[in-house]
Amino acid sequence: MKLTCVLIIAVLFLTACQLITADYSRDKQEYRAVRLRDAMRYSRVRRQCADLGEECHTRFCCPGLRCEDLQVPTCLMA
């Protein structure tokens, strides 16, 4: 009975340590340059919008346009 209680307490303690460590290291990355490069690449991709007549199923339409689902989703005048 004592051994069972000790094992349960040990498992709970180790679980708590794992959760604390995981939460502490969540936003840390060893290679910051890689993270920065990836962030810059994805921000450029996000800023590119589809112009008038371009497909909009993978990108948003530029301001003043709306995505109209004809046969192929296309950016048209709003």
Swiss-Prot record:
Give the subcellular location: Secreted
Note the Pfam families from the entry. Conotoxin
Classification via InterPro entries? Conotoxin
| Protein's UniProt keywords contain Iron | no
Specify the propeptide location in this chain. Answer: 23-45
GO molecular function terms listed in the Swiss-Prot or TrEMBL record: ion channel inhibitor activity; toxin activity
Major localisation: secreted
- Where expressed (tissue)? Expressed by the venom duct.
Positions of post-translational Pyrrolidone carboxylic acid modification = 48
Question: Mind telling me which GO cellular component terms the entry cites?
Answer: extracellular region
Q: List the disulfide bonds.
A: 49-62, 56-67, 61-75
Question: In the record, which residues are listed under signal peptide?
Answer: 1-22
| Keywords associated with the record | Cleavage on pair of basic residues, Disulfide bond, Knottin, Neurotoxin, Pyrrolidone carboxylic acid, Secreted, Signal, Toxin
Domain comment, in the record's words? The presence of a 'disulfide through disulfide knot' structurally defines this protein as a knottin. The cysteine framework is VI/VII (C-C-CC-C-C).
Q: Which family does it belong to?
A: Belongs to the conotoxin O1 superfamily.
Name listed for the protein in its UniProt record: Conotoxin ArMKLT2-0312
Q: Which organism is it from?
A: Conus arenatus (Sand-dusted cone)
